[in-house]
Structures are given as C-alpha cells and as structure tokens.
Amino acid sequence: AELPIAYSEGFSPHMLLSFASPLGVGISSTGEYFDMVLAEDMKTDEIVKRLNATMVEGMEVLSARHVPDGKASKAMSLVAGADYLVQFREGKMPEIDLETKVPVFFALPQIEIMRKTKRSEKLTDIRPWIYDMKAKKSGVWMQLSTGSVSNLKPELVMEAFCKWCGVELPPFAYTILREEVYADIGTEEERKLVPLEALGEEVE
C-alpha cells in the first residue's frame, strides 16, 4: 500500500501497529479496528484507498480516523464492549422460543458458569458482563464486556443460555459475527460506550 508507516527503534524494528481486540478463532466480523502510526500525515480517505487496493479478498477497510498524538494507545486501552450476532446454522436451531426465553434470561440477577483459567476452574457470575441481549431471527444478538479488565466470550453466554433452557447443542451449531467494538468514555459510576471510530476524526 506504500503507506509511510512508522517503525520502532532498536535492534529489531517493527511496524507500530496493533489490533484493538484480536478476533477469536472461527469468528467473523464487520467491525474490527487496528491502530497504526504513520511517519507523516495523510488524508484518511487516501489511507483507505491505498489499503483496499492491496487488500486480500474478503477483507475491506471501511474507514480511517486520525487520533491525536498520545491518545492512540489510550484509545486501545479504552476497549470495553462489543456487539455479537449469533445465528444458528440451517437445521441446528434448537427448540427454544427465543422471543420468550432471551428476555427472561437477560433479566436474571445472576448467571453463573464454570469458567476455566490457566490453573483451575471457578464458578463465575457473568451477568454483570452482559450489557444487552435480544432475540433475532434464527439467533441471538448480544453486547458483551470486552477488553483487558473483563472479556466475556459469546460462546460462554450461549452455553449458559442453552443450559438454562435445558437444551444441549451439537458441535458447530451456530456462527458468530462481531459487529462493533466499543470504548468506554463514561465514569466508574456510569458506562458510556461509543464505537472506537468515534475517538478519531477524518483528515482531508
């Protein structure tokens, strides 16, 4: 793409590029973000044009934004949420009335699962990390906590939901699409999620 990307200093220079929240294996997305440092200013639409001219099939850069100096790393550390659309594959839809069950499940005061860590397993209440949840045609939409502080996988939510419904899913019963990644610009008392794109601005 011939972008003037900046490199780190030292014996093993590398491009100053990082992803906001790496996508899990087997999950597709329409809302991924990465941060790169350029050695010189460029128009944001030109960045998009150059990247898409050399992009691999199946991937497209939708927009580019300039984040003021000193705030790029902060922007990445602000990652706090993500939207996911879980859709059951054809013939894999369980006998669950999603329109009825999903709101009741989301209204539960506590949702405990056995969560595996590197050293052990422990009972964890994941309800505080489920920000929103709605039934969709042949699936479930959810907004979950994402980031370094608390990172909840949609697979765990579906596992807990189906167990609560008394249903056991076969392997590869659904697909997962991540639609958006958010930053939290609120306070400790009140969460305020905005798309990462909103942290920057276009350069013309």
Describe the role of every protein-language-model region.
Residues 30-85:
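Ordered, amphipathic secondary-structure segments that act as subunit-interaction surfaces
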Residues 71-73, 80-120:
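Extended, positively charged loop/linker patches that create polyanion-binding surfaces
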Residues 5-12, 61-67, 111-119, 170-173:
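A short, aromatic/hydrophobic, helix- or strand-capping loop or linear motif
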Residues 44-55, 96-107, 157-158:
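Short amphipathic alpha-helices in soluble, non-transmembrane regions
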Residues 36-42, 86-92, 142-146:
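Short beta-strand-to-loop capping motifs
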Residues 6-39:
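Short, charge-patterned binding micro-sites
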Residues 14-23, 64-73, 119-135:
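Short amphipathic beta-strand starts and helix->beta connectors
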Residues 103-204:
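Core RNA-modification/binding signature centered on pseudouridine synthases
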